[in-house]
Curated annotation (Swiss-Prot):
InterPro entries: NAD(P)-bd_dom_sf, SDR_fam, Sec_Metab_Biosynth_Oxidored
Enzyme class: oxidoreductase
Gene name of the record: andH
The name this protein goes by in its record: Oxidoreductase andH
Pfam families: adh_short
Organism whose genome encodes this protein: Emericella variicolor
Biological role stated in the UniProt entry: Oxidoreductase; part of the gene cluster that mediates the biosynthesis of anditomin, a fungal meroterpenoid. The first step of the pathway is the synthesis of 3,5-dimethylorsellinic acid (DMOA) by the polyketide synthase andM. DMOA is then converted to the phthalide compound 5,7-dihydroxy-4,6-dimethylphthalide (DHDMP) by the cytochrome P450 monooxygenase andK, which is further prenylated by the prenyltransferase andD to yield farnesyl-DHDMP. Further epoxidation by the FAD-dependent monooxygenase andE leads to epoxyfarnesyl-DHDMP.
Length: 337
């Protein structure tokens, strides 16, 4: 793996291959998503960035900072509460009305982990925010990603590498489970769905990232300020700063180290590799497989045995079929309008 300094250098050269880029950051009003958006804006000559989230006040601050970082860019806010799939559909429709192409869909949205709560659409809220809503964004914006010629990529920041053996009779978590279990359950379905989508949409890369221990507002909300401070002290030697997280995430979102299964052109593989970099092994165990399960620093962290076991059972297809069925039940349409 390239070092952080080598990744910074690669990001600084990003405008050579991506003088313009269109990106949507779902969860870009704070934390990891906000920082990634700012890093990208500073690395590209003329970015067009959509900040997608709930908080208008936070969005106004982020948009102002983006304009200050790069006045040549275009920055817009799309307001949405992603805990309801019908809201996700409206947000995607708004994005489709504003652009005909999308180079990057970067998703890091999600509330703090809390006790089980069901939405008015009948789904477990944590699972919606960490899986169903993210996949609905992905599904709805695939046509825009397919229209890109700049290494189109979907990035989901969650718990790559922390997949588990799923309860096959409880995919929608109708049977209550803990918030931590729910998140790992969502991470598993994310990795499986991305592996499936990479074989169907072969010109698009799908990346599932474990962000590492990053000091963000969500840490305080999830643990409480006192416990968050204790956790931060304990994990500080293993932690990274928001700035470092932003550098790593921009690299994973653009680098040729994570190409789609079948790039349609030379640019389609991504920006130049950092010094010391190489094409990454995908979730299938093959180099350049199109779907990737990555550590915060861009290294492969696929649970090979677990994912192979799912592959033997064709479980990626099964999970995607379940996902479409859920979309049909909740929104009245398996496919977006």
């Amino acid at each position: 793996m390239p070092s952080l300094s080598q990744i910074r250098q690669a990001n600084e050269l990003l405008e050579d291959s991506h003088s313009e880029i269109v990106a949507a950051f779902v969860g870009g009003t704070s934390g990891v998503g906000e920082e990634a958006a700012k890093r990208l804006a500073s690395c590209v000559r003329k970015p067009e960035i959509f900040i997608v989230g709930r908080n208008e006040e936070s969005a106004a601050r982020v948009l102002a900072e983006l304009r200050n970082a790069n006045p040549q860019g275009s920055y817009q806010f799309v307001k949405v509460d992603i805990s309801l799939l019908r809201n996700v559909d409206r947000a995607c429709e708004a994005i489709r009305h504003k652009t005909q192409t999308l180079d990057l869909l970067f998703i890091s949205a999600g509330s703090a982990l809390v006790a089980r709560e069901d939405t008015e659409e009948g789904l477990e809220k944590n699972l919606v925010e960490r899986y169903y809503a993210r996949m609905r964004f992905t599904q709805s914006l695939l046509p825009l990603l397919q229209a890109s010629n700049k290494s189109p990529r979907v990035v989901s920041v969650l718990l790559g590498g922390f997949e588990i053996e799923l309860e096959t009779d409880n995919l929608d978590l109708t049977k209550p489970r803990t918030a931590i279990y729910s998140t790992r359950h969502a991470a598993t379905m994310t990795s499986l769905s991305m592996e499936h989508l990479a074989t169907v949409y072969r010109s698009i890369s799908f990346v599932h990232i474990y962000p590492g221990m990053v000091k963000t507002p969500l840490l305080d909300k999830g643990l409480g300020r006192f416990l968050a401070r204790i956790a931060w002290i304990l994990y500080w030697p293993f932690s990274i700063t928001l700035e470092q997280s932003g550098q790593y995430n921009v690299y994973m979102a653009t680098s040729a180290a994570y190409p789609p299964l079948s790039p349609e052109n030379q640019q389609g593989a991504g920006a130049s590799l950092a010094e010391g970099g190489e094409i990454c092994i995908g979730s299938t165990g093959k180099v350049g497989a199109g779907s990737y399960i990555l550590n915060y620093d861009g290294a492969n962290r696929t649970n090979v045995k677990l994912m192979e076991g799912y592959r033997v059972r064709d479980y990626a297809q099964h999970i995607w079929t379940h996902t479409l069925s859920t979309f049909q039940t909740v929104t009245g349409s398996a496919e977006p309008a």
